[in-house]
């Protein structure tokens, strides 16, 4: 009996060891699993200890970093105007960007003549380059925006061409060009001559015929050129001195109180006749200036010398002359188009009548 039960006891012992081993392995596995879970939990706890609102999700808004760039496409449209007008406008856009990188400008509203902040792309895209242009005035400080206003497209092109010519002159001067230096000297002399005070000198002894013909034509010429000028009236001996002192400050004004007329040698009749003639000369001058619609200031006196500082009325005819010419050309073009349309309609009608007649002939046949 005892011997037979021995194998069974041995088997029971091996099973017992197996069970203990299995239980121990399971405990180790459970402990290992628990420790891994706790390790990740503690790691997560450490990483999220400063976040009171919980973990950050992928759909949460990200902070804008300094290295990131956000760009907005700005499109300027050039649907009208000549190539020169487009070049001038593109140059203006480039210069505005130099002062204002975001293209914000102060625009002079032509309707109200007030400033309002605008984006340059709005102005450019709403400008008809066939008739209008833009002019920019640079700001006086970095805090200000450039000033932009509407002008005629011809003036914009001229301003652009003048700046290109000036830049070319500076480039030639920097390279030591002698020709450029001569051109600049000639232009400076012409500008000095143009800015010089224009004077028309008359003598008290001038005849009414010469005054109303020769001198009148000279006055009308200056008025047509819209030039400010001075009319000096005195004795023949004083005209040379007046011409030389016209550019000096108060040069002519200092001579108005003096006279070389020999009043003390005249009798009453001669004195009355001389004063009457001077009154007539001065009256004719006033009539002539009133006819030209000029403004003038009078200095001096009839018994000495007189000066009339003349300012012509602004001449708008020359400013509108080109516009009138363009309007006339446009009207002529419209008439030609209308005639061509009428001719085309007439030809079409004749062709239709010919076709109808041919068709009727075929039917009769």
Curated annotation (Swiss-Prot):
Where would you find this protein in the cell? Mitochondrion
Record keyword Calcium present: no
- Report residue spans for region: Disordered: 38-71, 314-333
Per UniProt, the keywords (alphabetical) are:
Mitochondrion, Transit peptide
- Composition bias type Basic and acidic residues, residue spans: 55-71, 319-333
Range annotated as the organelle transit peptide:
1-40
Say if the entry is tagged with keyword Ligase. no
Q: Name the major location.
A: mitochondrion
The UniProt entry, under InterPro entries, shows:
AIM23
Task: Please give the GO cellular component terms listed in this UniProt entry.
Answer: mitochondrion
Q: What is this protein called?
A: Altered inheritance of mitochondria protein 23, mitochondrial
Taxonomic source organism:
Clavispora lusitaniae (strain ATCC 42720) (Yeast)
The encoding gene is AIM23
